[in-house]
Amino acid sequence: MPWVLRGLRDGILTSEWPRGGDHYFDGFDAAVGVRTDADDGEPVPRAVADAAAACPTAAITTDPRPQLDRGRCILCGRCMTRAPQWFAWEPGCGTAALTRRTLVVGQVDETDEALSALRTTLARRVRRLRRCVHIRHVDAGSDGSDEWEIYALTNPVYDLHRLGIFFTASPRHADILLATGIGTAGMTEPLRRTFDAMPAPKVVIAAGTDAISGGLIGGGYTGDVGIADLVDVEVWVPGAPASPFSLMHAILLALGRLPQNSKAKR
C-alpha cells in the first residue's frame, strides 16, 4: 500500500523527450568540447600538449590544430584539468553521429549538404521501421557499464516502449543491432551471426567508446579496437558509457525520428 501512495504523490516521472523538452537531456555533460578558434600553424600551447600526453586513450591530437576524438574519449576529465582554456564539458545528450569522423571535434565540420544526404539515405532505408521497432543488443566485450545504461532505457523515467521501440532476444525479429564492447575474440563470430540473421532493412549502432574505438582495453590479445571491422556501423554514439538519453538520441537518429529542433547536425 505505501508504494501506491508514493506513486500518487510523485505523479508522472517519465520524460517527455523527444516530444517535449527535458532539462536533463539538454543540461547533462555528455561530451567534452574543444576550442575551434585556433589557426593552422599557430603554436600549440604547452597546456594542450600536456593534456594530449595525459590522455589515456590518445583521444587528443595537436596537428595541425587541437582536436579531440569523442570516439576515443572516456570522459576522464584530465584534459580539462590541464588545459581548461581549451577543453570543457559540453552539455547536451545529442552526441550520436552518422559518420565516424564527425566524432572528431575541433576540425572543420562536414558540409550540411553531405550530412543531409547521408541522413536522407539512411531514412529511406529504414522508413518501414518507424512505427514498431525491435532492438537486439549484443555485448561484444563490454565492461558492464554500457549495459546498465541500456537497461535504464526501459525504466519509468525513459520508457523506450512509449516510442514503439522494444528489445528482443531473437535477431530474426530485430531491426536494430545495438552493439557494445571492444569486439572480443570470443564474441566476433556471435556478433557476425547475429547481424547476418537479421532481416533487411537493418541498422547497426556502436554504443559507447569501447564499441567505437576499443577504449582503454581494446587492441590487446583478447579483442579488437571496436566493432567497425566486424559489422557495418551506421550510427556512432560516444560515451564511457553513453547515457540513456544519448542512446535514445542514437536510436531516433537511425530511424529519422529526431525532432526538427534537435541539436543534431550529424
Model-derived regions: residue spans:
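Ferredoxin-type iron-sulfur electron-transfer modules and their immediate structural context
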Residues: 1-54, 58
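Fold-independent oxyanion-binding glycine-rich loops
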Residues: 17, 30, 37, 70, ...
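A charged, well-structured terminal subsegment
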Residues: 237-266
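Iron-sulfur cluster-binding cysteine motifs and their immediate structural context
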Residues: 34, 46-103
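Flanking helices and flexible, charged tails adjoining ferredoxin-like Fe-S electron-transfer domains
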Residues: 1-15, 44, 78-164
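Cofactor-cradling patches in redox/metallo enzymes
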Residues: 148-150, 155, 164-246
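Local cysteine-cluster metal-coordination motifs and their immediate loop/turn environment
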Residues: 49-58, 71-82, 136-151, 209-216, ...
